[in-house]
Amino acid sequence: MPGLLLSGCGRGRGRVQEMAYVSAPQAILRDHVSAVFNKTGVVKNGDRVQILERERRFARVRTASGVEGWIEQRSLVPQSVYDGFQKLAQEEQTAPVQATGTTRNDTNLHLDPGRETEHLYQLNQGSKVSILKRATAEKTVPGAMARPTSTNKKESSKAAALEEDWWLIRDTDGRVGWVLSRMVDLDVPLEIAQYAEGQRTVAFFILNQVTDGDKKVPQYLVVLTEPKDGLPFDYNQVRVFTWNVKRHRYETAYRERNLNGVLPVTVSQEDFGKEGTLPAFILRVKDDNGDISERKYKMNTPIVRRVLAPGETKESVAPRKKSRHH
């Protein structure tokens, strides 16, 4: 059984050991559960401990170094939660990174999207993370259910709940979990962030680099959405920014709107025969039936075009003049 170990020889032979993990940022171990106690040790977030006994809201534990003491049970999570995080990290091991970001505050890493879901690890303010996926979870407004101002059940339900965006992230230690999206500031390069036009950046990628004098300048694919949580799509617009080496500025080489986009977006370099090796990217979009299809694009700077599979037809998209940014 996960989290349960058989002890070795001696008096404890055959006794099942229960393991747990510290979910609090830090907690003290005490020699008694009474109001007056002595500190026997300190455990930190993520530490593994053995449960020796339980008494009301406390558990007596033994650390890996052999220190024993009482700790509040609310500071612990069972082995099953730890195993869940290990499984999640394994499942998302090869998930393509959609963006990088920095935590705005200390924040908990959840096993599933939602404020009330299990959490184990805590990320410190300023932690660097990689964005993998997006999801939404319902946030119930405190006290909303106690206000029967409408007899319309649908209106009452909408007033009582809000949808929040969550990011699935990987930290620098390889831990994977869900955090509130508003707790992470994406590290969007300033030179393209200024052209977001009030929209929210969801993902960004370097397609390639061009030479301008003695420096290399990146060209970007940026995926955006409306500036609010709870939308039914991960993104609904994409833009490609290319660098004009004559005018030394970014220009919008491609823009597409009204997408029902689904992460992940994937970027690669691909051989296109006579055109040579070019940057390519794939967008995943959902139709009205909920079916997801892939759209491939290639960029032969500064032109971006769809790459149609055999038998595939391109939806009609109105041509757009190139936007210039000063």
Where are these regions (language model features)?
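Short beta-strand elements that form the blades of beta-propeller/WD-repeat-like
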Residues: 218-231, 277-287
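Core beta-strand residues in small-molecule sensory/regulatory alpha/beta domains
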Residues: 29-32, 97-100, 104, 108-112, ...
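Residue-level signature of beta-propeller blades and closely related beta-rich strand-turn architectures
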Residues: 55, 135, 225-228
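C-terminal motif of bacterial Sec signal peptides marking the signal peptidase cleavage site
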Residues: 5-8
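Hydrophilic extracytoplasmic domains
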Residues: 254-326
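Boundary regions of SH3-family modules and the immediately adjacent low-complexity/disordered segments
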Residues: 11-20, 50, 62-101, 144-215, ...
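Envelope-exposed proteins and targeting segments
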Residues: 18, 25, 39, 45-47, ...
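SH3/SH3-like (including bacterial SH3b) beta-barrel domains
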Residues: 31-54, 111-134, 140
